[in-house]
Curated annotation (Swiss-Prot):
Alphabetized Pfam families for the sequence: Pan_kinase
Binding site for ATP: 6-13, 134
Gene Ontology biological process terms from the UniProt entry: coenzyme A biosynthetic process
Protein name, entry field: Type III pantothenate kinase
Cofactor: NH4(+); K(+)
PANTHER family: TYPE III PANTOTHENATE KINASE (PTHR34265:SF1)
Kinase is among the record's keywords: yes
Pathway: Cofactor biosynthesis; coenzyme A biosynthesis; CoA from (R)-pantothenate: step 1/5
Length: 256
């Protein structure tokens, strides 16, 4: 069995996988820093509930954009599973014939995992991949599997937290679907502003990117917020919530 781990700025997503299929998803806040022992207790408890033996784990693959969390996860892998985990990095792009045509070849490992999966799921398409996480990342991947452009904007949760952080009286609100724009109380007004403002940003960026590229793009979204905004007046064609994990599974398949 495989454990695929996506360490993000907001959440750590662990997927227990068998036969290249996800059988259990676990989400842990990245804000609550834990030791390797604490991660193991949490993971082993979940596996016991599924009648799974942690000793059957034979590979661990990690994507991380938070180096301080990577260290205890590596310790978890080595101390409890006797596994030196694979850490996804840009050099793995060559395995999948993915070309990175960006300045300094800099690409977050979560975005690389997304591209690995997307290029397999949607071959021979020009893609716009929107990662809706802590930040909102727009990645352009052409049909020749070359990532050649990107734009980065705040994520929806950053918008919500910033209003609370930088004002004296506004409350912190949850992000939820809104049927209307204008409301008569401050909570719903803020929720609406964040929700519809984010959708307007997404649609505006898509429109400008398509105009600038002058070609049809197949648009997919992934990340923690993608379910919330899909099919509600957005130009997104499809969502792939587990795109990052699927990319890690593909790397496992190739390396096995």
């Amino acid at each position: 069995m495989l454990i695929a781990i996506d360490i993000g700025n907001t959440n750590i997503k662990l997927a227990i996988c068998a036969n290249n299929k996800i059988i259990k998803r676990i989400t842990i806040s990245s804000q609550s820093r834990r030791t390797a022992d604490e991660y193991f207790i949490y993971l082993n408890s979940t596996m016991n509930q599924l009648n799974l033996d942690y000793k059957n784990i034979n590979n661990i693959i990690i994507s991380s954009v938070v180096p301080s969390i990577t260290k205890p996860i590596i310790e978890l892998s080595q101390n409890y599973f006797n596994i030196d985990p694979t850490i996804l990095s840009n050099h793995h792009a060559d395995i999948f014939n993915i070309k990175i045509s960006l300045q300094n070849k800099v690409l977050g490992s979560d975005r690389l995992a997304d591209i690995i999966a997307a290029s397999s799921l949607y071959p021979h398409k020009d893609l716009l991949i929107i990662g809706m996480g802590t930040a909102t990342v727009f990645n352009l991947l052409n049909k020749d599997k070359c990532i050649y452009g990107q734009a980065i904007a705040p994520g929806a949760h950053i918008l919500a937290k910033s209003m609370r952080q930088y004002t004296a009286l506004l409350p912190e609100v949850l992000i939820s679907k809104q049927d209307k724009v204008i409301h008569d109380n401050i909570y719903h007004a803020m929720e609406s502003g964040i929700y519809w403002g984010y959708i307007t940003m997404i649609n505006g960026m898509i429109e400008k990117i398509i105009k600038e590229e002058e070609k049809d793009l197949y648009i997919i979204a992934t990340g923690g917020n993608s379910n919330l905004f899909f099919n509600h007046k957005t130009a997104i064609h499809n969502i792939e919530v587990d795109l990052t994990i699927k990319g890690l599974i593909q790397l496992h398949t190739v390396l096995s």
